[in-house]
Amino acid sequence: MAGLRRPQSGAYRRTAAAVNLLLGVFQVLLSCCRPGGAQGQAFEPLPNVVELWQAEEGELLLPTQGDSEEDMEEPSQEQSFSDKLFIGKGLHFQPSVLDFGIQFLGHPAAKLLYAYNPSRESEVVVNSVFTAARHFHVPPVHCRVIPAMGKASFRVIFLPTEEGSIESSLFINTSSHGVFSYHVSGVGTRRVSTEGSAEQLPNAYFLLPQVQSIQLSQTQAETTNTSLLRVQLECSLHNKVCQQLKSCSLGSDDALHLEMNIIVAVENSSKQPEENTQALLDHLSIVYVATDESDTSDESAVNMYVLHSGNSLIWIQDIHHFSQKNVLSLQFEPVLLSTSTTNFTKIASFTCKAGTSCDSGIMGLRKKKASPAMQACLSSPVVQGYFRTDASTAQFHIESHETATGVWSIWYRSHFDQSIVLKDVFVSKETKHILKVLSFRGPLFLPPGCWNIFSLKLAVKGIVLNLFTNVFLTTNTGAIFAIPLQIFSAPTKEGSLGFEVLAHCGMHYFMGKSKTENPNWERSLSLDRSTWDMDSELANKLYERWKKYKSGDACRRNVLGMSQFAFTKKSKETEPFVSFLPRVVPEPNLVLNFSATALRNSAVKYFVVRNPTPQPVSLQLLPLSLYPRPEAAVRLLHKWFGTDMQMVNLSTGEFQLTQACPYQGEPSEESSLGALHVHLQALETRRVGVVFTPADYGKVTSLILIRNNLTVVDMVGVEGFGAQELLKVGGRLPGAGGSLRFKVPESTLMDCHRQLKDSKQILSITKNFKVENIGPLPITVTSLKINGYNCQGYGFEVLDCHPFSLSPNTSRDISIVFTPDFTSSWVIRELTLVTAADLEFHFTLNVTLPHHMLPLCAEVVPGPSWEESFWRLTVFFVSLSLLGVILIAFQQAQYILMEFMKTRQRQNGSSSSQQNGDPVAMISSHPHKSTCKNFLDTYSPSDKGRGKSCLPVGPSLSRLQNAAKRSPATYGHSQKKHKCSFYYSKQKPSASAASSANVTTEEKQTVTLASSLSVAKEDICTNVLSENWVSLRYASGINGSLQKNLTLPKNVLHKEESSLKNTVVTNTPSECSMKEGVHTYMFPKETDSKISENVAELKEQEPCPQKTSKKPPESTLPKTPPQYLQSDLPEVSRKHGNKQQAPVRSEVDSFEPVRAADAEPSSVRKTQGASPEDTCSEKQDTPSAEQEDPSRKRKLQERREGSTQALNWNKTRPCRRNKKRASAQASSSPRPSEQSEQRLVCSDVRSWCAQDGAGEKCKAGTEVSGSSPERREEDSYYQKSEKKCADKFCSDSSSDCGSSSGSVRASRGSWGSWSSSSSDCDRRPVVDIQHFLPPGDGVSPQNFPSEASVPLSLPQHVCSSTDVSVLPEFTESPCPGLPATPAGAGEEKGLYPPGGLWPSQPVCLTSSFNCPVENGAPGVSQEPTSIPDSSFIDWSASCEGQFPSVYCPLELNDYNAFPEENMNYTNGFPCSSKVQTDFIGHSTPSTWNTPASMPAAWGHASLVNSPSYLTSTRSLSPMSGLFGSIWAPQSEVYETCCPISPATEHATHMENQVMCKEYYLGFNPFRAYMNLDIWTSTANRNANFPLSRDSSYCGNM
């Protein structure tokens, strides 16, 4: 070989990876001295991170993760610590900061640093530990393993060499987590001498000897259980340690061997000697501290320090050294080492005497020839915090030898401030068979200066070299120096064989074609169709050249990649084409084999690509699946490299490429298509990673194509295996079949028999299961869950429940405890094992218990701790609730009792006053109500037969005032509220029947009308539907003007007086006499026989003769009454439209206060001033009307003005009645309060009779015989109109219903239920017009003219007839029916508002109701009713006909639907003189004188004794009244209700029906009202009493 070729300056610069060094104090200069210059590269400082850039010829490397010696032998100049820096904090250090405190200069101190590995899965390998300052030292650490969840200790030694505070960093280089930095600090101080001056310390150096062996004495090795051990410790210090000492010169092969005899006191003599010696080594630390020559001495000293941290006592007896030359002097004294973990003890000192210089040995190694000498010079100026390399001083000089072996000596010049130890020198793996390291026999102590380190020898001959590799040097600082080395051969001269062979091969010529010579290569990088065309063309050219050169035997290549010179005379050897090609992959036939990898996980492996030529090379790396024609590429590779085409997967995408770590500032060349572009400079190496991510289970094999412009194509094989984690628990696989059984035999539960209940011991069953990893992957179980709960749930608990790891084919036992609650004999739960890869393995826990042992063992199982408290709280709260209910019930009952007592006291007080017979004594602020009460007292016993709902009549004034303060609707209703009972009387002849009150004076019609309204308040009790019912008939001379006048306001009535006089047939007093001397007495049905006798006595006192007409008079009805009504109704409707009806009703409503105001004085005067003898005289009535005082008139005017506001509201309140309550209310008996209202209405009717009927003869029976077909048409019309009117009512509040206080009457229909008054509103059929004849309170039959028709517009509270055409007027029937007005048109408005005249509740009586005539009076016609279309109503048919259970309230707008002319009062009224004066005391001359010839309508003899007709669902129990009336709400206004049905049949006698209107002041929903009447009267309990006990409601509250 002619010599070495030096690369051009700056042509082959290489960069290295970064090194993490904080506060570094080293600067490494690796110089390679060559003729022509030197190359190097500087280190750039970074805060806390120091990057080390590798130089071409010399660089500093630190071992990184997974870098073994083989890894470092790879020619990778990119391997730097920046690849692994700060990957993650994988170690925890304790203490967090290491502080040594104050230490004397030159005196070492030690402390332990503990490193913990928190990972539960992987272990951590510590490759090396080094420091950044010369004051801190760590004994050599090489590949120390820290197990998972384990710890390791490192001894850090602090040797201060300068004063002051010293802070530095300790660097721990790990295999998996990079480099960690750890802060250390200390303070150095000088030792003060006895003279008081500080000692001057020369430069000190820290040396660590190697302990070679430790031996026991022969006797102790054979003796056991000894307490003392004699140990011989042999350690060596390399001879080159003394080379720094100027006075010491040792041979190159000499070493300083020391032997220490140590006696150790053993604490535990039972241990083996080997264990004791190992413990001694672990706790014994030996260091050397060498010092330079001092000013006073030429000798250098090496002090020996020993640290013992164990518990045993150590006695150092002797120390010997074995040096071949007597150059060392030893000073030693035996010492007993104390136990300490920090301070060293100085035990010996060595002094090195003067010797020869070191330069002579070096000069002897130099060669005499002029070939370049090889020197190694390292300079290291310390710069705090970072490294810096001076390129001008970092040089390597390689000396060539003349011998064929080719040996090169490596020289090293160190400029460090302190010495370093060179531990090892090695070369990369690929060059082991080429290069050999010589002259290196172990660790070298390298003080500052220039030293011959080792030699390199080329082990091959006769080949052309083109080699680029590294030489690696390891030091005690933890740093590894990589020296780049390029070795290649060249012809010694032109024309030599080697040069010619290389030129004829033409490899460099071909490989040099890149961008300029072959531009198509760059276009083929797009991986389109042209890619394969380009690769195929270049590959064919290269192959043809190889065949050409091969046939000429010009050049051959071996498997090592180096050409061997051969002569043509030698035999030809067959070599493959691949051996001829220079490979970009250093390792031929390289296959990256990935171990088993879990799905969705990735594994990475790296390989190296290099450029073996001095020309740049461009590479494109890509998986085979991304190549345009992968099958063609595989065929080419099979042809060149012998690849197995069957095993290669052409389409797999599980392999991807990644660049290992791009250089800082250099952009990544990875393309978006998954290919990797790499540009390699001459001799450059790059590291490329392959990522394997399995997509399915199983093995997959593919190729990584390496397209290049050097050999066209190259490849790397890849192989991976997709695996899954698989566990077995208890020998069962997870899933449906993974059932882990807990079979509990009966013998296990026998303790339930012997166990006491008080002990409450918990039975549990424990079973162990083996968890096996049967898969190829390691598994880490992170959690165990039972039905979603960690470690325990539903009685199961996993003991020692913490994460654990399982390697493949390993197992572990887990214990599961089951605590049954003995509620079920079969318990099934799910055990889930969750791994670190988020995989879940499900197993079934199946427990079977003996079912017959469950009840016995369940008693032993203790309940939850909160169970007893829960039940106590439950019982406590239930008790409180029960107590509260009892208290509330007690208070309510007490309130009910108090209300009952109040009501009873009021009733008793009123009853006592009524029994005295003085009606004036009961007059209260409401005279008409008091009069109603007096009337009850007259005809009733002391308790008045009231049942459950009998309330006091007189309301309190406060209630009236409160009612007036309500809303306008309530106020309008609270103005007038009346209650009426209905009474039935039998006709008896009386002397007072001849008295006549017929006043026909035309000038007093208006006065009579006004006074009649006042008198009606007193007479209403006997007015509305009393027992003295009279017949109604229509006059034949009806005209429409009269009816219109009655419907108009008062001023209209005054204007039409003349027309009324001309139209109405007047009755003269002479003509108002009856043909028969029959007098009709009105008795309520509640009265007994004693009352009837009193009436008989009154009858004898009445002088009025009575005559009974035996022939019914002809009817005077018009021929066509339906046409008249149909024509009249629209006319009135047009006159009184929606806007005109309100004033009319308001004016009509104004009559009501007049009645209320005038009732009291008139009642008093009539009662006191009239005698029984003059009751029939009409002159007695006239002055009573004239006695009205002015104050009474003023009250009349005020009440007219005050009551108008309630009219409009009542007008718009139609009400529906619930049909279920209708029958019950229809069958309820009349009440005393209703009788009072009847009396009020009586006077009104008499007043109207006196005005309109003056001058006419009242002849009885004139209107029954006049029945005609036109009359029947009229009757049918009325029946139709009633059906049409049924749709007029709507729902309203209970105040508009026909029952009082929430329908006390309606409550009788159901036992103990609430009143249905509010729902009764839905039951009212439409009866727009109801005309009635209010019976007089003692008016004789002579008051009614027998020949004249009495026109009357009746109020709303009289039951209307269903069929008007069947109203009988004569009393030929055994018991005449009750008179009523037919239902008329629904559009007409009446005179009285709903608050004025309160209608009564209808009561249907039995058909057997008879009206006997006492004393044989001829008042009863013996002829049966032969006229079917009579004017009497069949009331029993009304009750049970078309609407048997429906109320029929009378509307305000229905009063004037029928003309008053058509109404004839043919029945006689009771002519009691005392009572008659109440009706006619102060009114105008009455026209109520009935002719003597008028037949009596109520002449049946069985009036009192006949049982009542009670049809409905009323309860007969007295308790029904209690439950039905206790909570009766107070209603405001109640409408009249009457069941309406067409009269289909007409019996020989008439059935009676009564309507009652109850009165209540107002409804207060927040107060309970109790209406009770306990039956205490014996008379009321009599079996002959006609009505039931709950039918005599009276009074209000």
UniProtKB/Swiss-Prot annotation:
Give yes or no: UniProt keyword Cytoplasm: yes
Q: Where are the transmembrane segments?
A: 870-890
Q: Which UniProt keywords apply?
A: Cell membrane, Cytoplasm, Endoplasmic reticulum, Glycoprotein, Membrane, Signal, Transmembrane, Transmembrane helix, Wnt signaling pathway
Q: Where in the cell is it found?
A: Cell membrane; Endoplasmic reticulum; Cytoplasm
How is the protein disposed in the membrane? Single-pass type I membrane protein
- Point to the regions of Basic residues compositional bias: 1213-1222
- Residues listed as glycosylation sites in the UniProt record: N343, N593, N709, N846
Q: Which residues form a coiled coil?
A: none
**Mind telling me which GO cellular component terms the entry cites?**
cytoplasm; endoplasmic reticulum; plasma membrane
Q: Where is the signal peptide?
A: 1-40
Specify residue ranges for compositional bias: Basic and acidic residues.
1269-1290
Cytoplasmic face of the membrane: 891-1597
Q: Where is the composition biased (Low complexity)?
A: 907-917, 1223-1239, 1291-1319
Q: Which domain of life is it from?
A: Eukaryota
**According to the UniProt record, where is the region Disordered?**
907-928, 1096-1240, 1252-1322
Q: Which Gene3D superfamilies match?
A: Immunoglobulins
Q: State which ranges are Extracellular (membrane side).
A: 41-869
Q: Where is this region: Required for Wnt-signaling inhibition and LRP6 degradation?
A: 696-916
GO BP annotations listed: negative regulation of canonical Wnt signaling pathway; negative regulation of immature T cell proliferation in thymus; Wnt signaling pathway
Q: Which InterPro entries does its entry note?
A: Ig-like_fold, Ig_TMEM131L_3, Ig_TMEM131L_4, Ig_TMEM131L_5, TMEM131-like, TMEM131-like_Ig_dom2, TMEM131-like_N
Q: What does this protein do?
A: In its membrane-associated form, antagonizes canonical Wnt signaling by triggering lysosome-dependent degradation of Wnt-activated LRP6. Regulates thymocyte proliferation.
Q: Tell me which PANTHER family the record gives.
A: RW1 PROTEIN HOMOLOG, TRANSMEMBRANE PROTEIN 131-LIKE
Instruction: Tell me the protein family, please.
Output: Belongs to the TMEM131 family.
Q: What is this protein called?
A: Transmembrane protein 131-like
Organism the protein comes from: Mus musculus
